[in-house]
Regions:
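Iron-sulfur cluster-binding electron-transfer modules in prokaryotic oxidoreductases
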Residues: 1-182
Length: 182
């Protein structure tokens, strides 16, 4: 995807959605995020709808720093050229890399749980409650890596009975999934 293709969807989108390769491995995440955007009438463009765009982290881990820098520069240009105000990411790894490695000059970078919380608080998204018990696992990169603990819990507590896990927050146990499956 290049900047011209992204801009064709909306001249000045409110949001650019970047799913990331881990979300592409679990397509229901992408479908759910798009369902939320539709329900809240979010004007957005989908940066990596067809896959093929990477945040650069796998390249960094492989020691390919030059390729990682090129990827980051290309992504940065695409995002800045889109005219979006907010970049929403569903992959905690991508979220951390965009926060730490990208200089997006005034573009807000949010994990999708943070954005959903905002949509609910603004009254743009209505949640339906149920009687289900919900246990939330803090992903390493999102929790310990970026300090995002409360937003997911705020949203989940509005849709069900949020149950405290034996180990959560900084004490949460790593699932081992991060980039090990790539």
């Amino acid at each position: 995807v290049n900047a011209v293709e992204v801009n064709a969807a909306s001249q000045s989108p409110e949001v650019m959605y970047f799913a990331g390769c881990m979300s592409h491995l679990t397509p229901r995440i992408i479908k759910s995020v798009e369902k939320v955007f539709k329900a809240a009438s979010v004007d957005y463009v989908f940066a990596d709808r067809d896959g093929g765009i990477c945040c650069g982290r796998p390249l960094m881990l492989a020691g390919k720093t030059s390729a990682a820098r090129e990827t980051i520069a290309a992504n940065r240009k695409m995002i800045l050229d889109s005219g979006c105000k907010t970049l929403v990411l569903s992959c905690p790894i991508c979220y951390k890399i965009f926060k730490d490695e990208y200089d997006l000059k005034g573009i807000e970078i949010l994990h999708y749980t943070q954005y959903i919380k905002r949509l609910v608080e603004q009254g743009r998204l209505k949640l339906s409650a149920c009687d289900e018990r919900i246990v939330y696992h803090d992903p390493c990169e999102l929790g310990r890596g970026c300090g995002v603990y409360e937003e997911p819990r705020k949203v989940l507590s509005q849709v069900g009975n949020l149950v405290k896990a034996a180990k959560e927050g900084d004490e949460s146990i790593c699932c081992g999934g991060s980039l090990g499956s790539l």
